């Protein structure tokens, strides 16, 4: 039987509870998920690639169905190299859907053998955004450590919190 491989691409800067929730939902649908950390020259990342890889490893260290890889270039080309037929995208709201749908259409035009699967965020995590986390972290010098952890706790796993604070 052929295994179903999916790619969950993103910058994961940092990895949030929202990302973790989408990965866990994807594990119910696919035999293997490649968490693919994309390199986007237009984005300035707060955390270096090695730290983002470590965040993912810490959260999924015991799960053999998950692998972590970094890549450059088009996501559909990466999927083809990895024999993945599916791209997972998390959807928090209609704005996410409209944006992700246009990307999915483009990807389909580039490679019609790769399907994008939209996984809705749970209500619990629909408000989470890496941008909000980065905004809090940019102001960390004005917040004591205990308060900083308290502010970030709704967004990040314990492993990620301990790594970045």
Feature annotation, model-predicted:
Residues 1-165:
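Nucleotidyltransferase catalytic core that binds NTPs
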């Amino acid at each position: 039987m052929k295994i179903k491989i999916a790619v969950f691409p993103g910058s994961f800067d940092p990895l949030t509870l929202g990302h973790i929730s989408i990965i866990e939902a994807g594990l119910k649908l696919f035999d293997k998920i490649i968490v693919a950390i994309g390199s986007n020259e237009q984005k300035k990342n707060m955390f270096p690639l090695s730290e983002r890889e470590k965040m993912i490893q810490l959260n999924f260290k015991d799960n053999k169905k998950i692998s972590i890889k970094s890549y450059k270039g088009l996501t559909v080309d990466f999927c083809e190299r990895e024999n993945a037929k599916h791209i997972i995208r998390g959807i928090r709201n209609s704005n996410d859907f409209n944006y992700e749908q246009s990307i999915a259409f483009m990807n389909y035009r580039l490679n019609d053998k790769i399907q994008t699967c939209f996984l809705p965020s749970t209500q619990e995590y629909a408000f989470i955004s890496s941008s909000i986390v980065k905004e809090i972290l940019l102001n960390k010098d004005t917040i004591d450590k205990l308060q900083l952890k308290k502010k970030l706790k709704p967004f990040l796993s314990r492993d990620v919190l301990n790594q970045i604070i």
